[in-house]
């Protein structure tokens, strides 16, 4: 994948930052940085990949090929998910913190799936990288801003309905039925929407 050097660079930068952080900051920052990794990979890089494929007429070829929309989208979700998982686990391993790696892995895969689907959906409606950036910035703000409020102590149960908060809780090892249901519903909804977006 053409973006692998950039993904590797992000991972290396994250690991370096975590290694030099004082211990009181490390626990919170580790989970936040691991969360941001699938967000950036899934949303930003997937958007760029889809735009490149559109410029190469891949979408038109897909329309007349035996490959289904579901197979196309799932291949993106799985490939980006595995890259995000590898990157996230490496960050966790080198952070010097203890983690529940099962919870972490599930959170990374679900987060990667969600934001990959968001990236596919957004890029289906635009044709240039500039337009994608205009849409991506407010999307990132909506996705990430509630985390700062949550980590500062405002931990209302209603906030668990926000996908990013649910993912942060899951990656931290704090499993709840509400957070699992919330992120599952968000992923299913975005999968349906991305299928409809690619078909249009």
Q: Which stretches of residues belong to each language-model region?
A:
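Hydrophobic alpha-helical transmembrane segments of multi-pass membrane transport proteins
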Residues: 26-64, 69-91, 135-138
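Hydrophobic alpha-helical transmembrane segments of multi-pass membrane transport/permease proteins
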Residues: 1-45, 134-147, 182-191
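Terminal transmembrane helical anchor/hairpin motif
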Residues: 145-197
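Alpha-helical transmembrane segments and their short interhelical loops
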Residues: 69, 77-127
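A structural motif at transmembrane helix-loop-helix junctions in multipass membrane proteins
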Residues: 1-2, 109-145
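Short alpha-helical transmembrane interface motifs in multi-pass membrane proteins
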Residues: 31, 39-44, 74-75, 99-106, ...
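Hydrophobic/aromatic residues in alpha-helical transmembrane segments
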Residues: 42-46, 90, 117-122, 163, ...
């Amino acid at each position: 994948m053409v973006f692998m050097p950039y993904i590797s660079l992000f991972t290396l930068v994250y690991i370096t930052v975590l290694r030099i952080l004082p211990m009181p900051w490390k626990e919170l920052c580790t989970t936040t940085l691991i969360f941001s990794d699938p967000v950036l990979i899934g949303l930003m890089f997937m958007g760029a990949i889809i735009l490149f494929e559109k410029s190469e007429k891949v979408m038109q070829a897909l329309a007349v090929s035996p490959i289904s929309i579901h197979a196309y989208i799932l291949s993106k979700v799985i490939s980006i998910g595995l890259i995000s998982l590898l990157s996230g686990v490496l960050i966790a391993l080198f952070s010097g913190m203890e983690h529940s790696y099962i919870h972490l892995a599930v959170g990374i895969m679900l987060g990667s799936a969600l934001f990959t689907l968001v990236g596919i959906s957004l890029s289906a409606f635009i044709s240039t990288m500039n337009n994608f950036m205009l849409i991506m910035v407010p999307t990132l703000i909506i996705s990430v801003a509630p985390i700062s409020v949550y980590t500062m102590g405002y931990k209302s149960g209603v906030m668990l309905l926000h996908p990013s908060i649910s993912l942060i809780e899951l990656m931290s090892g704090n499993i709840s039925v509400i957070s699992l249901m919330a992120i599952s519903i968000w992923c299913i909804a975005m999968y349906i929407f991305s299928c409809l977006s690619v078909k249009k």
